Swiss-Prot record:
Entry protein name: Parkeol synthase
Active site: 483 (proton donor)
GO CC aspect terms: lipid droplet; membrane
Cell location: Membrane
InterPro entries from the UniProt entry: SQ_cyclase_C, SQ_cyclase_N, Squalene_cyclase, Terpene_synthase_CS, Terpenoid_cyclase/PrenylTrfase
Primary localization: membrane
Naturally occurring in which organism (per UniProt): Oryza sativa subsp. japonica
GO MF annotations, alphabetized: intramolecular transferase activity
Amino acid sequence: MWRLKVSEGGSPWLRSVNNLLGRQVWEFDPDLGTPEERADVEKARREFAEHRFERKHSSDLLMRMQFAKENCQKLDLLAVKRGEHEDVMGEAVWSSLKRAISRVCNLQAHDGHWPGDYAGLMFFLPGLIITLHVSGVLNTVLSSEHQKEMRRYIYNHQNEDGGWGLHIEGHSTMLGSSLNYVALRLLGEGPNGGDGCIENGRNWILDHGGATFTTSWGKFWLSVLGVFDWSGNNPVPPELLLLPYQLPFHPGRMSSYIRMVFIPMSYIYGKRFVGPVTPVVLELRSELYNDPYDEIDWNKARTQCAKEDMYYPRSSKLDMFWSFLHKFIEPVLLRWPGRKLREKALATSMRNVHYEDECTRYICFGGVPKALNILACWIEDPSSEAFKCHIARVYDYLWIAEDGMKMQIYDGSQVWDAGLTVEALVATDLVKELGPTLKRAHSFLKNSQLLDNCPRDFNRWYRHISKGGWTFTTADDGWQVSDCTATALKACLLLSRISPEIVGEPLEIDAQYDAVNCLMSLMNDNGGFSAFELVRSNTWLEHINPTEAFGRVMIEYPYVECTSSSIQCLALFKKLHPGHRKEEVENCISKGANFIESSQRSDGSWYGSWGICFTYATWFAVTGLVSAGRTLGNSATVRKACDFLLSKQLPSGGWGESYLSCHDEVYTNLKGNRPHGTHTAWAMIALIDAGQAERDPVPLHRAAKALLNLQLEDGEFPQQEIVGVFLQTAMISYSQYRNIFPIMALTGYRRRVLLAGNI
């Protein structure tokens, strides 16, 4: 059986700033588990497979089974009685809350965070598998059990038409289909394996033109493997790093994510690296294309992309630009004396790769940069310490559930989920009863704060200040994020108002000041807060977006969600520490609120960049505006937002928004107008905070009943459709949201509607 290990690690190649706090790694133990426990696991796997086309998400049952056994001491909240003036509805809500809270407390890891599935994208795992294959360590790094579970995952998320999507809920794409087909073959499946699934996948690829129609990222990975010619790729010139930083298209001015992808990708492209041509590679050359491999027109393939993949079409001018680079510039750089410039650029790329690895303790900036950096380090020196350190951190990205083993978007969502969960629990009337849970979470957050900036001259490497901030995952990751810093600091501030005997000593005041400094440094001139860095270039750079499959990818943007989180935190900080940088804090809150107001769409909504979609962003926008003093009573913006949310309430009383809203930028209900627990909670929280209970509480009563009807017997809320997103099309699972936000919503409903007498 598989077992999740938390905050552990025995490899001499692991690097850490805080003893691996928050690290989560699954290990297989053939002797673990009773026959009954093993049977339960197999039952969960079987049931997922049987319903995989209608229920795309796992419920993270393997972790839940483990924690049910390890955290067997139940939190007894049954004795906590309802309020004196609560009616039958109040009793139902109070009972629901106690059950949900008990369940959440039992899902906490011993180090204080809440582990969970943070995956969803179908093109991450194949990139890792290709990297491990070409570097010759696939069977060393991944045991037979790892590989079996990876095959299970890929098969479970194959669509009925035979293809694979960009994400687990998406329609089949050439990127998802070609890469996952290749991954299965590299994991040992034959061309006719998987009870016909391999053949179905191959047929989908061939019926849609063959793998030449994959996106640029797909072409790149296939070229690395040796089943696509490098001449069929648009250039990824490392020489861009040698250009003056003042130029708006310098990589240092791009978004942090695209920069961390571009740099190692440009090194690998510049080297024209191709892995060993093995028998399976030769077979794939004949399986992926309708034409013989030696007869493919690679120059034509360079601009081909399947319509199923094309989200951000390239203009004819951009194609002409790529053709100019490909036909005239690249040949010069591949021959002397231009080769000298290429070598200088490659060396610069690798210095950037090594700096990023040092700053992130070889975790890197997500799953795609992780695989790319591993490969770049191996190409430079297969025996290097860097490569060994990278391999030790591969396991941080792997997560297993009843649907199989997947590669997460990052090495988890530890800090983000812990901060949100603390906020949800502190709002209840159960602080004393929840003391041990809150104390562990408090300790985790305090010890996950970034204590220093990146080493040496971090500006030279295009990094922003990080001292005082928090990451999305663990301190070892090293990438400060505005909303994660705000959420973690807000949680610590809320806990500082509770007796230290219950929740532990508060975060030191200097650490709070450092956090505020880091947070305020991420506000742009227009009042909006970016996620990782300030905006450094212009939106016109999106016109040279080379990815085809993603939007809003080229530069950093100010985000409504990040701005809201930041001003909520600063408003609470100002209340607790009114004398610290008073004018600056007030200016940030005021400008942030103005940015949110200016970003509202004509229908009263906001577009979500990090969650699905209009419900998510509108919840954030409203709560941010309320923290800045706006309400239904004094703000036309808030009234318009509430009217928008109410217009989307379903007959069931809930809300349910499809990921298609992100893709199409038009609000779209879930199929069948089904209510979604997390979306319902987001809408409820926004309406309650805005003052809807005083205007008309009926929609809130209906929403609360919808949530109660969704709750499961064990106290949890169900895992439903996908709720996270980035780059407009990349959908992400947040498995803890299913409980965090219903608890927040029902707590607010109980306190501000029922107990306040708004019946």
